[in-house]
C-alpha cells in the first residue's frame, strides 16, 4: 500500500508519514557512525570512516569532519555528495553574515538556516530530501559551546551527546548511561572512543577507520578547530586501551 504514497515527497500516507523522508533516514542508518559529545571546555566529534580500498589515501581524504567557519564544525553521516552541497551552502551563509554584521554567525542561527534549506526539499515536488544527518559543534558569545543534531526532515535540536549513522540507537544508549555534565574534553574523547569501539561493525578500531575533531577555546579566548592526525589518533587509542602499542602487537 505504501507504494501509492512513496513516489513523491509532497504526499502524506494515510498514517501521516512522508515515506521519502523515512527512506532518506534509512540511507543514513547504513552510513558510518558519527558521535558528538559536549564537555565543559569544548565539543568532541568522532566519526567512523568506511575504508573501501587499501589504495585510498586516507591521510588526504576527509569523509566525516568538515569546518564550516572558524567557530563551527560538523560531523556527517549519510550520502557524502549531498553533504558537500549543504556544507558549501552553510559556509556561504556564515561568510555572508560575517560580511554584513562584522561578527561570527551565532551557531544556532547557522544550523536553523541550513535546516530551512533541508526542509524545503521535503515540501516541493520534483525534489528529494537530502540523505544526510549532521552533528554541528561550535561556540559563540551567546550560548558558549553547543552541539546540534539535524536530520533529513530539516528538524534539529540541541544535545549534550548524540549519535547518527549505523548503530546509533546502541550508541545513544551507552551515551545516556555514561555521559557526565561536568566531563572535560579529555573525558569526552575517552567516552567517544568507548562508544565507537562498542558499536562499530568491525572487530578492531584503528586510526585509519576513524576521524576525531575537537572545538575548544585557546588561552587567548579564540575558537580552535583541531582535527587529530593518524599518529595522534594512534596514541589516543593506545592511551585509552583501545589498541595495543605496535611493539606489543608484533
From Swiss-Prot:
Cross-link annotation Glycyl lysine isopeptide (Lys-Gly) (interchain with G-Cter in ubiquitin), location: 40, 64
Expression across tissues: Ubiquitous low levels, higher expression in siliques and flowers.
GO terms for biological process, alphabetical: ubiquitin-dependent protein catabolic process
SUPFAM superfamilies, per database record: N-terminal nucleophile aminohydrolases (Ntn hydrolases)
Subcellular location: Cytoplasm; Nucleus
Cystine pairings recorded for this chain: none
Main subcellular location of this protein, as a coarse class: cytoplasm
Pfam families in the record: Proteasome (PF00227), Proteasome_A_N (PF10584)
GO-annotated cellular components: cytosol; cytosolic ribosome; mitochondrion; nucleus; proteasome complex; proteasome core complex, alpha-subunit complex; vacuole
Keywords from the UniProt entry: Cytoplasm, Isopeptide bond, Nucleus, Proteasome, Ubl conjugation
Function: The proteasome is a multicatalytic proteinase complex which is characterized by its ability to cleave peptides with Arg, Phe, Tyr, Leu, and Glu adjacent to the leaving group at neutral or slightly basic pH. The proteasome has an ATP-dependent proteolytic activity.
Sequence similarity: Belongs to the peptidase T1A family.
Subunit organization: Component of the 20S core complex of the 26S proteasome. The 26S proteasome is composed of a core protease (CP), known as the 20S proteasome, capped at one or both ends by the 19S regulatory particle (RP/PA700). The 20S proteasome core is composed of 28 subunits that are arranged in four stacked rings, resulting in a barrel-shaped structure. The two end rings are each formed by seven alpha subunits, and the two central rings are each formed by seven beta subunits. The catalytic chamber with the active sites is on the inside of the barrel.
Name of the protein described by the UniProt record: Proteasome subunit alpha type-4-A
Amino acid at each position: 500500500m505504501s507504494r501509492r504514497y512513496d513516489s513523491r515527497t509532497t504526499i502524506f500516507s494515510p498514517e501521516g508519514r512522508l515515506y521519502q523522508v523515512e527512506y532518506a533516514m534509512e540511507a543514513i542508518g547504513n552510513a558510518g557512525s558519527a558521535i558528538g559529545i559536549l564537555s565543559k571546555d569544548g565539543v568532541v566529534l568522532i566519526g567512523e570512516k568506511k575504508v573501501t580500498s587499501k589504495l585510498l589515501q586516507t591521510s588526504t581524504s576527509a569523509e566525516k569532519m568538515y569546518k564550516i567557519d572558524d567557530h563551527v564544525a560538523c560531523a556527517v553521516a549519510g550520502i557524502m555528495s549531498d553533504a558537500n552541497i549543504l556544507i558549501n551552502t552553510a559556509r556561504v551563509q556564515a561568510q555572508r553574515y560575517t560580511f554584513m554584521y562584522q561578527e561570527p554567525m551565532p551557531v544556532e542561527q547557522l544550523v536553523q538556516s541550513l535546516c530551512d534549506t533541508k526542509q524545503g526539499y521535503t515540501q516541493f515536488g520534483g525534489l528529494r530530501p537530502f540523505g544526510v544527518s549532521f552533528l554541528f559543534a561550535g561556540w559563540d558569545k551567546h550560548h558558549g559551546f553547543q552541539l546540534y543534531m539535524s536530520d533529513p526532515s530539516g528538524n534539529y535540536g540541541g544535545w549534550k551527546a548524540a549519535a547518527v549513522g549505523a548503530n546509533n540507537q546502541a550508541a545513544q544508549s551507552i551515551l545516556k548511561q555514561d555521559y557526565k555534565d561536568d566531563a572535560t574534553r579529555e573525558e569526552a574523547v575517552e567516552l567517544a572512543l568507548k562508544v565507537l569501539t562498542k558499536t562499530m561493525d568491525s572487530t578492531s578500531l584503528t586510526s585509519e577507520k576513524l576521524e576525531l575533531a575537537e572545538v575548544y577555546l585557546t588561552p587567548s579566548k579564540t575558537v580552535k578547530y583541531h582535527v587529530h592526525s593518524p599518529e595522534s589518533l594512534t596514541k589516543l587509542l593506545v592511551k585509552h586501551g583501545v589498541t595495543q602499542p605496535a611493539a606489543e602487537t608484533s
